[in-house]
Regions:
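Binuclear metal-dependent phosphoesterase catalytic core
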Residues: 65-73, 87-141
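His/acidic metal-ligating clusters that form di-metal
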Residues: 1-82
Length: 141
């Protein structure tokens, strides 16, 4: 990650902006949500909610420095994830938007077809100058 970003910065003679897309959330999604629920000024609420039972955020429980490197390098503006099908929250933490995309499935959990409000899409609009917006779109049947 770091080498690629620095190589792109050199190639284009400017600091490139990036976004990351993963299936499984990073542990910082949980950290940011916990800080948000405690009212910490370190986290800015963007939209949505955690819908999984017990406010679950499923992430690998092993040491990882990817997020710290993203903050240090300063290129990554947003990280988009899925996995937890009932979560659809967006939070800004340490300058990076942490965003759960909406689910599109009917098969993830028993009875999920009866659950309303979690299906849809996340529209990312990116301008030529690097400015972007994120809009959650709820699918209504």
């Amino acid at each position: 990650y770091e080498n690629t970003i620095y190589e792109l910065n050199r190639k284009y003679e400017q600091d490139v902006k990036s976004m990351a897309f993963f299936h499984i959330p990073m542990s910082e999604f949980s950290t940011a949500f916990q800080l948000y629920t405690q009212g910490s000024p370190q986290v800015q609420y963007l939209f949505g909610a955690i819908g999984e039972p017990d406010d679950a955020i499923s992430y690998p429980h092993k040491e990882d420095t990817m997020f710290e490197k993203m903050v240090e390098v300063g290129s990554t503006q947003a990280v988009f994830v899925g996995h937890d099908h009932l979560n659809n929250i967006g939070l800004k933490y340490q300058g990076i938007d942490l965003v759960y995309g909406r689910s599109i499935d009917y098969l993830a959990y028993p009875g999920i077809k009866k659950v309303k409000g979690h299906r849809g899409a996340t529209l990312i609009t990116l301008q030529k100058d690097g400015v972007y917006s994120i809009q959650p779109i709820v699918y209504h049947e």
